[in-house]
Regions:
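Surface-exposed acidic, glycine-flexible loop patches that form ligand/cofactor-binding
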Residues: 13-18, 77-81, 150-151
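Mobile cap/lid helix-loop segments that gate and shape the active-site cleft of serine hydrolases
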Residues: 2-7, 35-79, 85, 106
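Generic secondary-structure microfeatures
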Residues: 28-31, 84, 91
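Short, proline-enriched alpha-helix->beta-strand connector loops that line the catalytic pocket
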Residues: 17-22, 81-87, 121-123
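Conserved short-loop catalytic and cofactor-binding motifs
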Residues: 12, 64, 68, 99-102
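Residues at the C-termini of beta-strands that transition into short coil/loop
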Residues: 28, 53-55, 131
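Primarily recognizes the serine-hydrolase "nucleophile elbow" in alpha/beta-hydrolase
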Residues: 1-41
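C-terminal catalytic histidine-bearing segment of alpha/beta-hydrolase fold enzymes
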Residues: 87-102, 108-151
């Protein structure tokens, strides 16, 4: 989820190429880097502050305002727009929003919230976890084959 970074008038042939994806399939994605969102979705969230220069999560949460521009630039959730490609999100356990998770960094709570945000922006998002409803593709390979072959 990012605007195209290509430079169509560049002399550099590589720089002229689009950076946009046509689809994405990910496993256990941390779809937000915002510590406030992370704590709301999964109270025992504790990972991510190091990417912004914080040694622990409490300092990250307390210093959130100082890195809001970076969160807006790099957090997948904040980058979703109506022109984004379809995504396939795979998680190993069902979601439980607002509850502590065994693996808070890779919880399907991230997938639930990203899917909601994608739906608000008319972006196709398939969320897969054990016993998930509305799964259209048996696995990431099936999703990718369909999207990449135009079937």
């Amino acid at each position: 989820f990012h605007d195209d970074l290509c430079e169509p008038t560049s002399n550099d042939l590589v720089a002229r190429q689009s950076t946009r994806l046509c689809c994405a399939a990910v496993i256990g994605a941390q779809t937000s880097l915002d510590p406030k969102q992370m704590k709301e979705w999964t109270p025992n969230s504790k990972y991510g502050g190091h990417a912004f220069g914080f040694l622990d999560f409490k300092a990250f949460l307390n210093g959130r305002d100082s890195v809001l521009p970076l969160l807006a630039e790099y957090s997948p959730y904040s980058l979703v727009t109506k022109d984004d490609p379809p995504v396939y999100l795979i998680y190993s356990a069902p979601p439980s929003l607002g509850q502590d998770q065994r693996d808070p960094t890779h919880t399907s709570n991230f997938g639930v919230k990203l899917k909601e945000h994608c739906q608000e922006n008319d972006v196709s998002c398939e969320l897969v976890y054990p016993d998930a409803p509305d799964v259209l593709h048996a696995n990431a390979t099936a999703f990718l084959v369909e999207k990449l072959s135009g079937r």
